[in-house]
């Protein structure tokens, strides 16, 4: 009965590989799977669901951090603070739609001056006075 059972003198057991590294992700697939099971979102959780969810969360985090890093660089800062995350999210149309109801602590408000409060354009008033003089 060759090929059955453990071979004598077999090498050491294969080193365990995490599901995150198998999927090429940084986010923890095992932890997300545990949360999905403990949360009772469904009776059973498929094997691919936590991998997919981890990939989606990692993509969203990378997107927000990239935009926040750009906002920090625009403000000549080397550290991302909540204000930079707020500016990044609110200046992106899709992220604003996704996180519209979320409040970012210490994020501040978006700079906005109502059009009626802005000073009138000097060039447009000169053009109208020149036209009046010609008539």
From Swiss-Prot:
CDD domains: HFD_H2A. GO terms for biological process: heterochromatin formation. The keyword DNA-binding applies. GO terms for molecular function: DNA binding; protein heterodimerization activity; structural constituent of chromatin. Pfam families: Histone, Histone_H2A_C. Coiled coil: none annotated. The nucleosome is a histone octamer containing two molecules each of H2A, H2B, H3 and H4 assembled in one H3-H4 heterotetramer and two H2A-H2B heterodimers. The octamer wraps approximately 147 bp of DNA. Core component of nucleosome. Nucleosomes wrap and compact DNA into chromatin, limiting DNA accessibility to the cellular machineries which require DNA as a template. Histones thereby play a central role in transcription regulation, DNA repair, DNA replication and chromosomal stability. DNA accessibility is regulated via a complex set of post-translational modifications of histones, also called histone code, and nucleosome remodeling. PANTHER family: HISTONE H2A. This is Probable histone H2A.1.
